[in-house]
Amino acid sequence: MTRFFAGMMMLLLVGACAGSADLDDAPVPLGDFSLTHNVVVAPNAQRGPFSRPATDDQLIETVRGAIAERFDRYDGPSRYHFGISVEGYVLAVPGVPLVLSPKSALILNLTVWDDAAGKKLNDEPQQITVLETFGTGTIVGSGYPLSAEEQLLQLSQNAAKS
C-alpha cells in the first residue's frame, strides 16, 4: 500500500513539473477567478542539505513573480487572494554524474481567501512540494546546467502550475 501511495504521489509531482512551457497557450478555465493579492513570505525558510544559498528576498520575489505570471492572466469578477509561505528549498549543487546528482526542491504552504465570502477556502494551509523539471539534466542533476537563480525560477514556475 505504501508503494502504491508513493507511486501516485510521484505521478502527481511529475505532472506538476512542466514549468512555464504552457504559458503561451490559452489559460485553463478557472471560472470567474481573479487573483487580487499575491502575498509571499519566507519567515522560516529552511535551506535543505547540499543546497546552494538563496536569500529570503530571492525566494519571495521569484515565487511571487511565477504566481503572477500564471494567475494574472485571469480577469474574472470573483476575487481571490493567495497567502504563500516558503517553508524550505534545495537548490542543487553540482554533483558527481551517475554517482551523486542532487535534485532541486521547493516547499510552500498555500492559503486561499475568497474575497466575497470574506474567509479562507482552506482552514489549514495546503503544503505544496515541487521538484525540478525532469529532462533538465536529470542524469547529472540541475546543479550542473542551471545556476541557483535558474533553478529557483524553474521550481517557482512548477509550484505556480501545481
Where do the PLM segments sit?
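A structural "domain/chain start" motif
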Residues: 17-61
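Sec-exported extracytoplasmic/periplasmic mature domains
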Residues: 68-72, 91, 160
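Short secondary-structure boundary motifs at beta->alpha junctions and helix caps
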Residues: 47-53, 119-161
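N-terminal, post-signal-peptide region of Sec/Tat-exported proteins
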Residues: 53-79
